[in-house]
């Protein structure tokens, strides 16, 4: 089935809002013929779902779409940002407290990195917040070994190409020296794999600690390691209301598992 019925909501968006996966991953599920509408297997994401129609993914009914929720999580070093790891290493889900809804990470922090990781139950929101076009700055505190060349450090503001990969502008500032290590503040608007480590290595600095302090308007602040704190509904609406239409949600913020 691939016809697009008038009205209703795009099926990939509906699956993402139900917290099953991101919108892009939902489109992949559909083209892989793993999604059905009223019992008919779909092969195109260009389908709208009307109220009362039944959607299944891998034969299981689609969960009711929950109100959009966003959480701040203090990721510890040594946890993989993934649902499972083929090498058997601990993942962020092994460190999360019980009682949370099904959550997806916004972007990622590699296993050796720590600090602020946003989690959401809304796949569409996850995708929007990951896009560089959103314009949100990711800010990091970085400890790195090596001699700081201030001219090369400032040159990162023009972007850099490392091993054939082009990175956008990076703001890097030396805060202080601690023995043979430098503490820096680094800010960027995109999140390519291991970007901070690679651009600093490009200017002769080897990162040995990386802490994300902020993702857009959301700050790590004093949130303890492994703790999760929900972003209050009003703050969520104020900060991302222009990105997605969010229904009002009378709920109190929660903090869990400072562990």
Roles of regions detected by a PLM:
Residues 1-259:
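Basic, flexible Lys/Arg- and Gly-enriched helix-loop patches that mediate nucleic-acid binding at interfaces
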């Amino acid at each position: 089935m691939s016809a697009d019925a008038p009205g209703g909501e795009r099926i990939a968006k509906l699956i993402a809002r139900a917290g099953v996966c991101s919108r892009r991953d939902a489109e992949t599920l559909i083209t892989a013929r793993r999604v059905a509408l009223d019992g008919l297997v779909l092969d195109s994401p260009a389908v709208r779902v009307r109220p009362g129609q039944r959607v299944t993914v891998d034969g299981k009914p689609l969960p009711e779409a929950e109100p959009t929720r966003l959480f701040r999580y203090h990721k510890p070093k040594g946890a993989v940002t993934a649902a499972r790891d083929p090498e058997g290493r601990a993942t962020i889900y092994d460190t999360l407290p019980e009682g949370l809804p099904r959550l997806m990470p916004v972007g990622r922090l590699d296993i050796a990195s720590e600090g602020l990781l946003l989690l959401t139950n809304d796949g569409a929101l996850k995708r929007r917040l990951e896009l560089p076009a959103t314009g949100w700055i990711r800010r990091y505190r970085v400890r790195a070994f090596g001699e700081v060349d201030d001219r090369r450090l400032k040159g990162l503001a023009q972007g850099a190409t490392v091993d054939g990969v082009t990175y956008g502008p990076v703001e890097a500032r030396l805060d202080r020296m601690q023995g043979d290590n430098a503490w820096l503040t680094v800010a960027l608007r995109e999140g390519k794999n291991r970007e901070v480590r690679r651009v600093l290595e490009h200017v002769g600095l080897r990162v040995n600690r990386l802490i994300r302090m902020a993702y857009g308007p959301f700050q790590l602040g004093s949130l303890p390691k492994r703790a999760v704190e929900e972003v209050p509904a009003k703050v969520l609406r104020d900060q991302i209301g222009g990105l997605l239409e969010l229904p009002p949600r009378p709920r109190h913020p929660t903090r869990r598992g400072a562990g």
